[in-house]
């Protein structure tokens, strides 16, 4: 190497200030520059020296000057603290790499010459050494041309280290000028900037400027003990340098740590995308206590026994990771940076996620009633996926058809749809609940095998492992689909058999047209023992009805969607670590930026991609015409979900057929009477319009389910808080209603207490206040109520009636004691029922419509939608894992409450009217009848009257179960015997009717046509003479923990 390469290039003056020309900068190429698409920088960053400081010491050297550098690359800004000695080290590293590469090139020439002479092959090679203890070992990447242009002149660094005599101000000023000049040297050329040495100096990596992971924070080499040896990119295990082995010990592994808003990621090296580990910060552990004002910390320095070791630890959830670096100063920097990244501010309801939509941040929501529209919307979203799909559920069936009739849409079967997307390169992550097989028959192992065999891009985990975790009683109950971090679906609908339904809630499908094979589902009659022959019927369609399914689901866009994705990532990583820690094909996931909570960012810009713009007046409501809250006529770009544009002509008329005169009519037939938009289509009652809303994700999780440091019960807190603050009206649909009053010590959730207190407050204030609750008429488990194998059904009935109407513990008993008959003015309970013929000219049958919704609407302004039931399992946080969303309207329509003007929310009001129109059998022109939900004309004369009339008709025609007049097991057996004698065959809940009624001689079908909608009264006195419905000692359920049932 010629000595002239060490001389100052043209443009450097004798005053020591570097003034590089563009030509000189271009000639200084970086060593080990990454080629092509592997570069970190694709344009030059900018750097400025903010300040220069000198130590307080008389023995001063310019090498001790400290520089605060502010750097900017595109929209990313970050600050570095560097000493002059580190800059000198950078310079020597660049020079050394140039020498090594030239020697390597000469060595190859000598090797070829010796080989051509046939003498011997050179053994060994130039060994690379690390520049400093926290550098990484990376392979060299160079070309012949790049070697020629890799000179970084040594004299360019001399002004930084040249001894300076004079006043401190002069030293600092000249140091600033010299440093700025040297920064200009290696920041003026992309090859130099993308070198390993410069990227390490700037503390950047592949993740630094990935916008989806948020702002640029601290990065650098650390060593960790909990990882195995890291394999290098060439297959060689990446170990510590020789001089570090004695320092750290062979069990410590060097990794590149990347701190981002909300998580700490450990990579193999800065230029590798391989994620070795990740800690997603657990906000619950940061809440602290009211007694202590000290801010809890994520990181803290560790006192090492060896004074030459410098360590710290990071704690999040149930994990603690120990790390080491090369100096005490770096430990302090890391501890400070991690604590700043996890700085906590409390969230409403104690949730991990903040309220979204307070500004115009893109938070939007859309509701779906029943599986028909929800499944089609999910299918549409999956079809348009481009990068990643996350899915989790209590039960998932790969052979589920997302659009019906099923024979017309084979490509929209779930497994086929996922296979298509996986082959297109979309990564699909599916998290299944691993059931206790003796208790449940959902066969998640079969689902896992089917899904794994689809394609290598489909990754599947089942969790928990019951033996190792000790978790036998609780389940993962969330129902989530997330597509490209852009849209997510949550609510009550699992992607499994039995859930697909329409507003008609047909009870028959013979021959199969809508519900193939085991999708013709009635768990009251029979649960399949095997799900492998999915197209084979479990039930005789000519004898047994299916059990119709009523549910509510929603889609979310914007930051709420990414909060849901953060929850999925947390659960996935927790399951991966516990279930498949050594499975290389199952990766860890990193949360995207919008999943990161604003408190992690402090005063930083919250959204790098598109900063949120505050509304002009966020407190000013947006008032819409009432019909806008129902219109589905938005442009396609506003609603990127599937809105059915036409109805299959034969779809509505096949199968049974419920022909009752009270059924909802086509909106088009009453357009002259309706105040709705003319664009309302046939499905107006099943899908809402995409709306700007305030949304907050709430959940139930704990250490076993998500690895959190303590249980989160934000769903429970949200329910209680919203009930307490309701002004006029609460509407609840839920699969269960099991709760306790304050004096209750068995049932621990306090939803019932909140309702009780709110009703008493309304009574004391003499104000109109209504609570309407819709739940299943019977638990959706196999077995007749009097059957020996139906202990689960009876146990659930026990706890539910204990909450609703039984003496001593129930809300109705306690309210009746204070209010008497006025109790029903405040609160009432209902169920849903449907009827039809099992096939053309077949028997008349009925079945309860199984209410599986997990919904609460408050004052037509706030809606809670999710997976959580009202029971201890779902609400306490330490049991089943759940997720939900509180949706608060930002756009309003004029309505009324008890005859007074009321601004109802577009989302909540339209959803409530959709549900009520379905339950009451209203058509489009009758929406005004339910505009005011609490006035007597609606609540008593329409809602309660319709339920009572329908109930009386069903009792007259079927004498079906449950029945207000059946109050003991003896009466139940008597009723069952009479029906079987008359009909010869009936269902487990007496669901078959004679063609003509002997009591009046009337045609049963004609009488049933007098019903309207599906609403019926909940039988409060059913089995009330049976003191205890809990399992007896001769039943296996007796030996199960009681908490399983409530």
From Swiss-Prot:
Induction of the gene: Up-regulated by auxin. Up-regulated by phosphate limitation.
A single GO molecular function term of this UniProt record: phospholipase D activity
Cofactor binding description: Does not require Ca(2+) or any other cation for activity.
Biased composition (Basic and acidic residues): 653-667
Region (Disordered) residue spans: 653-677
Major enzyme class: hydrolase
Cellular component, GO annotation: membrane; vacuole
Domain PH: 215-343
EC number: 3.1.4.4
Reactions mediated catalytically: a 1,2-diacyl-sn-glycero-3-phosphocholine + H2O = a 1,2-diacyl-sn-glycero-3-phosphate + choline + H(+)
PX domain: residues covered: 45-205
One of the GO BP terms on file: galactolipid biosynthetic process
InterPro entries given in the database record: PH-like_dom_sf (IPR011993), PH_domain (IPR001849), PLD-like_dom (IPR025202), PLipase_D/transphosphatidylase (IPR001736), PLipase_D_euk (IPR016555), PLipase_D_fam (IPR015679)
Pfam families named in the record: PLDc (PF00614), PLDc_2 (PF13091)
Tissues in which the UniProt entry reports expression: Expressed in seedlings, roots, leaves, stems and flowers. Highest expression in roots. Detected only in the meristematic regions up to 4 days after germination and then at later stages in all tissues.
Start and end residues of each PLD phosphodiesterase domain: 472-499, 847-874
Domain of life per record: Eukaryota
Residues the record marks as active site: 477, 479, 484, 852, 854, 859
Family: Belongs to the phospholipase D family. PXPH-PLD subfamily.
Stated role: Hydrolyzes glycerol-phospholipids at the terminal phosphodiesteric bond to generate phosphatidic acids (PA). Phosphatidylcholine-selective. Regulates vesicle trafficking and auxin responses. Required for the normal cycling of PIN-2 containing vesicles. Contributes to the supply of inorganic phosphorus for cell metabolism and diacylglycerol moieties for galactolipid synthesis in phosphorus-starved roots. Involved in root elongation during phosphate limitation.
Protein name in the entry: Phospholipase D zeta 2
Species annotation: Arabidopsis thaliana (Mouse-ear cress)
